[in-house]
Amino acid sequence: MKRIIACGVWIIFAMMLLIIADLKYARAQTPEAAPDFAMEDLQGVNHRLSDYRGQVVVINFWASWCAECIVELPSLGALFDKYKGRGLMVLGITTDRKRESVEPLLKQSRVRYPVLLNTAGSALLKQYRIIGLPSTVVIDKNGFIVERSAGRMDFDSSAFTGKINRLLDSAKRK
């Protein structure tokens, strides 16, 4: 009986890995408009996604208790610093409810992109189909989701920066 239960657990685990692997670097099959939202950052400045139309937007969903999330903060910050002058916006959306949980990590990691407190709660996570943290969504200049990723990413990788360069170089659709 224990063997059957153990086998069942392994099958479920393997299925979850396949689902996550399928989401990793997944491109949207048909253009999907990114749901608009408005949230305040840690300094109280309001950000609306639609305000960034015409720019490539990388949204990173994370939390202070998520070790993998914290590991990717420096490479995400480097991506922002490298491309912000070319039309890239990075928005970090934390699931933490309190600024005090987040601010020390951001200071330590020297994060300079806006970090928003997810006041919309699970509704926003559902709209963006976020199933785990960290998760990253890339939105093109026209406001369409072009990539979704679950799990830690290396934003310094040539594969990712190549995609960002192609998106930045592409003309905005009318």
Predicted features and spans:
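Bacterial N-terminal signal peptides
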Residues: G8-I20
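N-terminal "domain-start" segment that seeds a small globular fold
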Residues: L23-L49
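Short pre-active-site segment immediately N-terminal to redox-active cysteine/selenocysteine motifs
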Residues: Q55-V57, F61-W65, G132
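Conserved redox-active cysteine motifs that mediate thiol-disulfide chemistry
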Residues: F61-A78
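Thiol-/selenol-based redox modules, centered on thioredoxin-like
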Residues: V138-K174
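Short, internal strand/loop/helix patches
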Residues: L91, E103-N142
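Structural signature of beta-strand start/N-cap positions in the alpha/beta core
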Residues: Q55-V57, M89, P114
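Positively charged n-region of N-terminal signal peptides that target proteins for export
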Residues: M1-A6
